[in-house]
Design a protein with these regions (language model features):
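N-terminal periplasmic/intermembrane-space "pro-region" immediately following the signal or transit peptide
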Residues: 2-69, 410
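Surface loops at the rim/top face of extracytoplasmic beta-rich domains
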Residues: 221-230, 248, 259-261
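Outer membrane beta-barrel
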Residues: 37-63, 77-217, 225-232, 236-242, ...
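Outer-membrane beta-barrel pore domains
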Residues: 24-28, 43-46, 61-68, 76-77, ...
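Alpha-helical transmembrane segments and their juxtamembrane interfaces
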Residues: 14-15, 108, 307, 383
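Residue-level detector of intrinsically disordered/flexible regions characterized by low predicted structural confidence
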Residues: 4-7, 91, 343, 405-407
Length: 410
C-alpha cells in the first residue's frame, strides 16, 4: 500500500512539474546550447580512452626437455616455470588536440628480477603531431616501436605465433626505443592500414607507408650509452588485388651499439669503449588471410657477437628470417586460424649476455580460436633447436613443447 501511495505521489509530482513548465513564459527558459557551445565545453580529457589486453600462458605441456629455454621469447619456457602473465597491458590514448595524438602504454606484468614479478613499466609513451588536416604527414616523439620489421610492428595481441621471430626481434629488442620518427601515408592508405587491424586480418598498425627516424639504439627503458644515434628507414605499401590485400616492404637501420657493463662477463675481451657497428636490412612480404595468408621476412647485416675462439666480442655477420602460413575460417559464431611458422637465425644477440652468438631453427604449429571479440585461445606445438655461445656457456639444446595462451581484451 505504501508503495502504491509513493508511486501515485511521484506521478502527481511529474504532472505538476510538466504543467508548470508549460505555463512558464518562454523568456524565462534557458536556450538550448548550440553545437558550438557543446564542443567548446568539452575538455581534452574527455577525448582520452582506456583499453588493454592480457595474455595468460602455460608453456610446459608435453615438454620433452626442461633445459630448453629462450630468454628473448618467453622466460616462462623451461624448467622450474609455471603459469604466467606474458603480457598485461593498459593503454591511454586519444587526441587532446585535432592534430595531436597521445599514446601511453603500461605493462603490469614486467619482471624487476628473477625473484620479483608484476611490476608496472612503461612500454610506449609518445605523441604524434600532424602537419595537415588529413594527418598524412606526422612526426612522432617519445618511446615507440622502431619501424623495422612487420613482425616487430605487429601488436602481440594480433600475432599468430606466440613470440616474435629471433631473426627480426634481435635487431630491435623490445621493439621499442626513444627517438623521433617522421611518417607519411596517404589518407586512403591510412584507412586501409586501420581496416587490416579492425577486420581481424592481423595488420601491423599504422606506421605510414614511409618512415624515417632517429633513435638512441640501446633499446626501450635503457639509457643512451654513446654519442651516436641510430637511423632507420622503412618503405611498405599495402594494396588490393581483387579480394586479396598484399603488403611488400623494405627497411634498414644503422648505428653504434654499446654493451652495458652488467651484460659482460669478467674476462671477456671487448673494445675499449665497448661500442660496435650495428646495422641491418630486411625484406617483408605479407598476404593477409582472406582466407589463406602468408607472412615472411628475412634480414641480414652485422652486429656485435661473441667469438668463442678468441673469447672476445667483435662485429660479425648475421642473417635469418621466418615464414608463416595461415588459414582463416569461420566455425559457427567463432573464428579458427590454424597456422605454421618456420624460423631460422644465425648471428649475435647484442642485448644478451656477452652478445651471445646464436644458431637456431624452430617450427611452430598451432591454432588460434577467436571465441569472441574479447577472448582468444591459442595452442601451439614447437619443435625447437637452440645453440649459443657466451664467455661462460656453450649452450646446445633441442626439444618439443605444447604451449597454451588465453588472451583477453578489454
Amino acid at each position: 500500500m505504501k508503495l502504491h501511495r509513493f508511486a501515485a505521489a511521484a506521478i502527481a509530482l511529474c504532472i505538476s512539474a510538466g504543467a508548470y513548465a508549460q505555463s512558464t513564459p518562454p523568456d524565462s527558459l534557458k536556450k538550448a546550447p548550440t553545437p558550438q557551445q557543446i564542443h567548446s565545453a568539452s575538455k581534452w580529457y574527455d577525448k582520452i580512452s582506456l583499453k588493454g589486453y592480457a595474455q595468460f600462458r602455460y608453456n610446459r605441456l608435453l615438454e620433452s626437455n626442461p633445459d630448453l629455454r629462450c630468454d628473448q621469447c618467453d622466460k616462462g619456457i623451461g624448467g622450474k616455470q609455471g603459469f604466467e602473465f606474458r603480457r598485461a597491458r593498459l593503454v591511454l590514448s586519444g587526441n587532446p588536440h585535432d592534430r595531436l595524438f597521445m599514446y601511453i602504454q603500461f605493462d603490469y606484468s614486467s619482471d624487476a628480477s628473477s625473484t620479483s614479478k608484476h611490476f608496472l613499466q612503461i612500454r610506449d609513451a609518445y605523441f604524434d603531431y600532424s602537419f595537415d588536416k588529413k594527418k598524412e604527414i606526422r612526426v612522432r616523439f617519445g618511446q615507440s616501436k622502431v619501424p623495422y620489421g612487420f613482425d616487430n610492428l605487429q601488436s602481440s595481441s594480433n600475432r599468430l605465433p606466440l613470440d616474435r621471430s629471433d631473426a627480426l626481434n634481435s635487431g630491435t629488442p623490445n621493439e621499442r626505443d626513444f627517438g623521433a620518427f617522421l611518417m607519411y601515408a596517404p589518407e586512403k592508405k591510412r584507412e586501409l592500414l586501420k581496416r587490416l587491424v579492425e577486420d581481424g586480418l592481423k595488420g601491423s598498425g599504422d606506421y605510414g607507408v614511409f618512415a624515417l627516424g632517429l633513435y638512441n639504439g640501446q633499446s626501450a627503458n635503457k639509457p643512451e650509452l654513446n654519442d651516436n644515434l641510430h637511423v632507420v628507414a622503412r618503405l611498405s605499401y599495402p594494396f588490393q588485388i581483387g579480394n586479396q590485400i598484399v603488403e611488400p616492404g623494405i627497411q634498414a637501420y644503422s648505428g653504434q651499439f654499446t654493451l652495458a657493463k652488467d651484460q659482460l662477463s669478467t674476462g671477456v675481451k671487448i673494445k675499449e669503449n665497448a661500442t660496435y657497428t650495428d646495422r641491418r636490412a630486411a625484406f617483408s612480404l605479407v598476404l593477409f588471410p582472406q582466407p589463406f595468408g602468408i607472412q615472411a621476412e628475412y634480414n641480414f647485416g652485422e652486429s656485435p657477437a661473441f667469438d668463442a675462439e678468441t673469447d672476445s666480442i667483435r662485429v660479425q655477420k648475421l642473417h635469418g628470417g621466418y615464414i608463416t602460413a595461415s588459414f582463416r575460417t569461420k566455425a559457427g559464431n567463432t573464428t579458427l586460424v590454424p597456422f605454421v611458422r618456420y624460423q631460422v637465425y644465425d648471428g649475435g644477440k647484442k642485448h644478451e649476455a656477452d652478445a651471445r652468438l646464436y644458431d637456431m631453427n624452430e617450427t611452430e604449429i598451432g591454432v588460434e580460436w577467436q571465441i569472441s571479440k574479447n577472448l582468444e585461445l591459442t595452442l601451439a606445438y614447437a619443435i625447437s633447436r637452440r645453440k649459443y655461445d657466451d664467455f661462460k656457456t656453450a649452450y646446445n639444446e633441442k626439444g618439443n613443447l605444447l604451449r597454451l595462451q588465453l588472451q583477453t581484451s578489454y
